[in-house]
Amino acid sequence: MAERNVLGGELEPCGMDPLTGFYRDGCCNSGPEDLGSHTICAVVTAEFLEHQRRIGNDLVTAHPQYRFPGLVPGDRWCVTAVNWLRAHRDGAAAYVVLASTHERALEIVPLEALQEHAVDVPPDTADLDA
């Protein structure tokens, strides 16, 4: 069965360069081994990266042993739901690609919070009914 995103559709890839995902498959797939719930497809910003560094989650420094290249603003990366929510509460949330965010993220983060930072939906959906 295909993995689902927070909108109920099939989970779409998050990022191939750098190759993201807990399983390094380009998707924010999750399973029992993924204790951190790396389920949110984020488009990282400098503010988000600095926030993560301040809370002890350095996403800038490369760690080749984990196939982690280090991130720069604009990269798409599967981040943990808990750390994204903390950044959201602290006013430093990264942008979110809803179609690439695993439904398991909803166990931790309300859909409304993700939608506030979504970059894959038009700002005004009124014209979509036409």
What function would you assign to each model-found segment?
Residues 1-47, 120:
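Extended boundary segments
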Residues 103-130:
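Glycine- and charge-enriched low-complexity intrinsically disordered segments
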Residues 43-58:
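Short, basic/aromatic beta-hairpin or loop at an interaction surface
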Residues 60-67:
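Short alpha-helix capping/helix-loop boundary micro-motifs
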